Amino acid sequence: MAAREGISGRHAVLQALRSGREVHSVLVRKESGEDPALRPIQDEAARRGLTIRYVTEGDLVRTVGGSGQGVGALVAPLAEHSAKDLVLLARAQGEEPFLVAADGIEDPQNLGALARSALLAGAHGLIVPERGTAGIGAGAMKAASGAFSLLPVARVASLPTALANLRREGVWILGADANGGKAPWKLRLTGAVCLVLGSEHDGLSQQTLDALDERVCVPTPGGDLSLNVSAAAAAILFERVRQAEAKRT
């Protein structure tokens, strides 16, 4: 039997269907079958020739690992990429690589939110270490609202090694560091860049810090508390969007 994994939540399932990702089955909680919010999923499943299975909540949880919004699906695993693949993908589109990397992010919801922000900001891919970082399971998929069906992901054995290889490809390595760094708007973010985000508690590992070209820190004039990792990422990512738009006008 072909490998498959479970996802749950309306956005995650709908994006999987629309993206062309291989979907083996769609499951809807019986009590949610008449929910008008599920109509786009039902229509897209029909377009792809998939018969929706209406199941109990218990069966939904057992099959896909969650019951978010009463809908889930069994899908093919994400395509495997290397960090260099992401660079080549960007350059094939005639663009400078714009990548995001996660260093020890443990909360699946934060990883999912990071993927969502990266996709919406126009990143070409996400780099995730094989160890020490949350897996891309049901929790991350739900928080990403379908982003993982559209955003290429590279799983790497060693993030510092991957960053060193990216530098050899001409990619500038920028790390978000709550302990200090330049404000995002004081840096030129529109070239070939990989933005690295650290763990919720410890930030970037020393090995990753040693691999950086520059550090960036989002100022928080309202107090000494630090931003959540996904919030800090969004602030930096969309400063890059602002700079890119300003460059075009």
Where are these regions (language model features)?
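RNA substrate-binding interface of SAM-dependent RNA methyltransferases
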Residues: 18-22, 37-40, 50, 88-182
